[in-house]
Amino acid sequence: METRTEPTPSSTVPGGASQSIVIAIAGSGGDGVALMGDLLLKMAAHQGLYGMLVQSYGPQIRGGESAVILRVGDREICYEGDDTDLLVCFRASDLKRFRGSIHLHERSVLVMDEKDEGELPEWLGHGGREAYRHPFATFDGGVEVAGDPKNMMALALICRALGWSEALAEAAMRDCFSHKPALVDRNMPTFRKAFARTDVPALASLKGHGVPLFVETGNEAVARGAMAAGLQFFAGYPITPSSEVMETLIEELPEAGGRLVQAEDEISALGMVVGASFGGVPSMTATSGPGLSLMTEMMGLASMAEIPAIIVDCQRAGPATGMPSRTEQSDLFHAVFGGHGDFPRAVLGVFDVVHARDVMFRAFELAENYQLPVLVLSDAYVAQRRQIRDAVVDRRDRPQRHRWSSPADGPTRFSLTIDQPANPFRVPGTPGGTYMAAGIEHTEEGNPSADPVTHQRMSEKRFRKLESIAADTRTWVRTLGRADAPRGIVAWGSMYGVLQEWAAEHPEYRVFMPEIIHPFPLEAFSAWRKGLKDTSTVELSFQGQLHRYMAGLTDMTAVRSIARSGGLPMSKRELAELLAAPAVAATKE
């Protein structure tokens, strides 16, 4: 085998000269691609390395091509990188689905099966390089081996390339299959043989901190963040890509004294949440776009009756069924404006796995304090990624609802003269606190009313909550880059990872990322944009929903809209091309 120069890792983690390595594995259903990604991420975490794993798969229930992209480094990572340092591909034909997800640089290492004669796609960027050929099904002389030869050999060669030991791999396997030790015993001999005989170039060495770190998905972080914030009741209906929120809570919420119900549909799920919250219990549901559509009328009920309710929306691409396993940022309009009639709600966005816990605290704080629905917008890219993070020890106080205890706390449930954004909440069963909560317009006592003057005054009362929220959350933003940089980017949600690295590598840019989307932090935005030469909004939405939403709040005529449909997250390479391209129009109105 010819000698090749040691590959240079393709990406630098923000904050200095820290290096990271990007590995991709592509195969078909049954090849164990996802399992290998999970095992490698566990190995990184065991050493105190940081990392991030994203999966790419189709909407089919079983089978089809799948790929994982793993990036590991010695600092926190929330973007998978542009170029792959090591690609393991079981069949060239498996790569056809992953255009835009996997790209090689000039010194990448490519490993393929020795019997595969398929042609690599030009978009891969392989430049005609010769692949390292390995016998994924058999070893020297065609001798069959025990276990699953294909993925065990691939795992072994990746460990060799990274300089990771057999013991580390075995520890990760036993951790992953603690309930099936015999499975590990059956596969380890295969791994050891492959590890001893595999010949692959070494990648740059990465040294971890030595203290094991914690692996968590975005959905798991949302679930655990909600529990830490005081969640006691969850009702939901499974839907990709949010299902893991409920799956996590099924295992963990009852142990914390909470209750969970799998409802018959999304309408029922939010109805149960509103009912439980009416009973004084902090409650939440999680869904995706189609489910959010069904929940919208019930959102209006929560707002009209002034009942706290948390709705987590893990966005998928497209309307209707759309692309269930793909990401997009196209539910912003629905979250901010969806529903008949005028009713207030707050909307938050999730940046990454680490941020997800903080967002859930903020969501419960707003819901409990202001007694209204709060929507938390995640998406498939954040929800289903696996990210290595530091262990969490949360000592924050849980948000507490201001409860009514006696007439001294206010004469009526919906008093118009109270000095605070929301009236003290009357929990059913509190002596003297009986009232009617309904979706119909009502008087201060909760009695039905069709009086236009009452409707106007109650609407003003409900919407004053947004004024108070805007004042209390004006610092809920994150800015990246130099404060005096001449060029600006405005984005939200899962764009955070790529823009964090973009700002670190391009000092001419500053970035504005609101944690709260509605009400929008206009005061912070106005201060941030001063002195900018040019500004762009960047988002995964065909309509440019963020840009259009902001145009209704402030002058955006000089701000360029960079927007495309979702499906794939935006890379630094694509971002560079879009920012360099001539502007088609100054604004989208």
Positions of predicted regions on the chain:
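Active-site cofactor/cluster-binding pocket
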Residues: 2-229, 233-235
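Flexible, low-complexity linker and terminal segments
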Residues: 8, 215-219, 227-229, 359, ...
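Thiamine diphosphate
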Residues: 18-99, 240-337, 346-367
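Short gly/pro/ser/thr-enriched loop/turn and capping motifs at secondary-structure boundaries
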Residues: 58-61, 117-120, 139, 243, ...
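Short beta-strand segments
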Residues: 89-91, 111-113, 287, 310-313, ...
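A short, gly/pro- and small-residue-rich
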Residues: 97-117, 306, 546-563
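Gly-rich Lys/Arg/Thr-decorated short loops/hinges at beta-loop-alpha junctions or inter-strand turns
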Residues: 177, 196-210, 226-231, 249-256, ...
